Amino acid sequence: MADIQLSKYHVSKDIGFLLEPLQDVLPDYFEPWNRLAKSLPELVASHKFRDAVKEMPLLDQSKLAGYRQKRLAHLQLVLITSGYLWQEGEGGAVQRLPECVSKPLWNVSNDLGLKPVLTFADICLTNCKVKNGDIEVMYNLPGGAGTEWFLKVCGLVELAFGKSGQAIQNVLDGAKANDKAKMASGFTDLTAAIGNMQTALARMNENLTPEHFYNGVRPFLNGFGGPASPISGGLVYEGVSDKPVTMIGGSAAQSSTMQVLDGLLGITHSPEKQAFLDEIRNYMPPSHKQMLADLTNMPRKVPQVVAETKDANLTKAFNGCVAAFVQYRSYHIQVVTKYIVTASKSDSPKSLAYKDTGKSDLIPFLKEVRDDTEKVQQ
């Protein structure tokens, strides 16, 4: 069995895929980026953000030092991009991004292996800082406290999963060594972590209404390109290429957590669904994408080890973990229904699907993925 160590993929056993704490501003040379990213909500609200971006100097991204600075720069630049594109709402979107943003964003994206668009890795994994066991949001999108709460809850869900790092490692190490007790312990702890993820996700209801999310937050997470997109022809990155680029928008579908659990528990999907999930991986940090590939390609997968042991305690722990994951996915469907489907009264199903999953039917897709999860019970 392949030796998979979380640290190899820049995954912490304490905070998972969240980026280790870093400074929330770049060095003084990049102060124009710091200032615009921090003041985005106020400047968008006053309809002055685009003008401020146009006055921004073209800075040299090669002066960034190290991986974390580059991740922070990517966060700032995609936030600036989002504010610039969507300041006037979906009906007032522009189709060209000024060179002062597009060129450094393109180059930083190439350095990191990330897409030059707002992704979950930016708005959550980089933007949510773990502080005293809680989540602190460094940069906000327009919408005030409701928007900040949405971002914080996304971070809390990731943190709940992140605390299962040792449990996941125990399952993998136990499977490699045929250590039934270690695997069972890992599954038990992972089951608790999935329950904590659901508890964290349920907190969305405390300070975020469906109307605020759909009309206030979601537009700033939009991608571009395609018949249902407000920027149907794609976005031109000035100073990079005159050819418009198509990108999907940022969403929790780009979180690696669900696909890690799929890989660990041996959950498989139809070729069509898997093709979409594979495409989503291209919007994740490369090390996280590699971890998913390695989990998928393990020659002797975890469920096979569980089945071969014929150990009642291990099988019970495995099935309990699968059941918790099914329950989480069922609850996630309820959240999506409340905050996206029900709130999208003016959007066609096709438009809704484009904006949120790229699938032709959002809820049926999520239900099928949940049903695929249930099938791996032993």
From Swiss-Prot:
Keyword Calcium assigned: no
Signal peptide bounds: none
Cellular component, GO, one term: cytoplasm
A GO molecular function held by the record: heme binding
Keywords per UniProt: Heme, Iron, Metal-binding, Oxygen transport, Transport
Cofactors named for this entry: heme
PROSITE patterns named in the record: IDO_1, IDO_2
Protein name in the entry: Myoglobin
Species of the source: Haliotis madaka
